[in-house]
C-alpha cells in the first residue's frame, strides 16, 4: 500500500486526469429518493482501518468513539506477507507483526473487547510469488497457514492487498493463473465464519467469481471516491472512499464524500495509516456525513512499545 501511495504522489497529474473520468464529486445534498440517515445502525456502514504496525500501536484505533461504540469496526494489522521459498508458499510475519500476535492479550484482545474485529493484513514480499501465481499445492499450503494463524491468534479474519509480489521473479510464473480466486475459496472453506476483505489492487479484479466469499472490497485510491464497485461487489459490500489518515483531507471534504457514501447505499469506508496523534477532526467529518453523528477522541495515545 505504501507502494501505491508513492505511485500516486509521483504521478499526480496522471491521477488527476483519471480521477476526472472515474470520480463523481460529492455534493452537499441528499438524493431526493433517499431517506434521511439518522443513526449509525440505519446505514450499516463499516469503518475499516489499515494500521502500519511497524510504526503504530494498533490500540490507537480504540481511542475514537461514536454513538457510545468504537468508531472503527475493523482494524487490519498491516501486514504479514506471502513469501515464496523454493517450491513453498509461506506465511511470513516480520518481528513487529509477530510480537503483536504473540502478545495478543495486550495488543489485540483490548480492541476485540470493545467490539472491533481485528484482521491480519496479507501482502506480497518481493519474492516473485504472490496470491495470483500459485499452483494448486501452493494455494492449499498458504491457505492452511493463514487459517491456522487466524485460529492460533484469535483473529477475526484477513485482508488481501496484492502489492509487492513482483510476479515472475526467481523463476516463479507471471500473475493471473487463477490462484487468487482459488485461494479465497480455499480460505473461506477453512474458516467460513471469519471475515475476508480485499483491497482493489493488482489482480483483485479476478475475484469476481468468488466475491460472495468476500465481506468487503476497498477502493484503492486515497482521498477520492469512485461510485463503481470492483470485482463485481454489490454496493452494500464496497468501500468507495478511502482516506489516507497520514495525509488526510479536510473535515468538510470528508463529510461531503461520506454523505454520498451513505446516500448511495455503500457498505463501508476505508482508512489507511492511522497515526498515534489525534485525528478526530476528519473522523468527525465522516461521522457527520455518513452517520449524522459525532466522533470523539478519548485522549488515549498509545506509543509503539514493541
For each predicted feature, which ranges?
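Secreted glycan hydrolases and related glycan-binding modules that recognize and/or cleave
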Residues: 20-306
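Bacterial Sec-dependent N-terminal signal peptides
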Residues: 1-32
